[in-house]
A protein has these predicted regions:
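Long, structured stretches of catalytic cores involved in phosphate-ester chemistry, encompassing
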Residues: 3-216
């Protein structure tokens, strides 16, 4: 993870892309007692608004993450984009220099996280571990998505139950990610549909929603 800092610093291209194995943005689980949250934050440096979802992500390597984000901020490096997999879910994230929960700090990068085509995510985990089998479009998953975004305000959009892939395209003006979801993960001929799109303009390090994909 620490090598990402030197790689970004040395690149002279317009877009500095980090091929990222695990989610960079903080992912906290809501909710816990404010007193407990403050205690954890004081002892560990973790964001004070939740408990980390997975310590194998960059949340478990917070000093390395801050080393990267502070280097980007200090050197005023523009157009850093992390393209991430592993978590099997879809996220569009603003990356801040510090993930302290108030979202008043400096944005230094963006992150596009792609889902899995067939590997387990939230709906499969509920079915396998709890025995609760729900369709991917069940309202429960919308509630989960909204709760994660409320707790993690740097997460501009997330989709935790649908399967598919993300296409990222970059040009001189912007970088855009288009998420597509398969209609039926058990049927390779079921087709696909567009899910959502987010983009960042050159020089801004901030995401905004897009009404349609670049290509389908």
């Amino acid at each position: 993870r620490s090598s990402a800092a030197s790689d970004v610093y040395k690149r002279q291209c317009l877009w500095k892309v980090i091929g990222n194995p695990v989610m960079m943005a903080a992912l906290q689980i809501p909710p816990i007692s404010p007193e407990i949250a403050d205690f954890i934050a004081a002892k560990t440096g973790a964001p004070a608004h939740g408990i980390m979802f997975n310590s194998d992500q960059w949340d478990g390597y917070q000093w390395d993450r801050y080393r990267l984000t502070s280097m980007i901020a200090k050197n005023n490096i523009k157009n850093v984009v992390a393209v991430t997999g592993d978590i099997h879910m879809s996220f569009a994230n603003d990356i801040y220099e510090k993930f302290d929960g108030n979202m008043k700090g400096r944005r230094v990068a963006v992150e596009f996280v792609g889902p899995s085509v067939t590997a387990a995510n939230v709906d499969d985990i509920l079915a396998d571990k709890v025995g609760l089998k729900l369709p991917e479009n069940d309202p429960l998953f919308d509630t989960v998505d909204k709760a994660l975004q409320t707790t993690n305000q740097h997460i501009r959009w997330c989709q935790c139950s649908k399967h598919g892939y993300v296409v990222v395209e970059m040009n001189r003006k912007f970088a855009q990610a288009d998420w597509f979801f398969v209609n039926n993960k058990s049927n390779s001929r079921s087709g696909q549909h567009w899910g959502n799109s987010w983009a960042t303009n050159e020089g801004t390090s901030a995401l905004y929603p897009v009404k349609k994909p670049l290509k389908f």
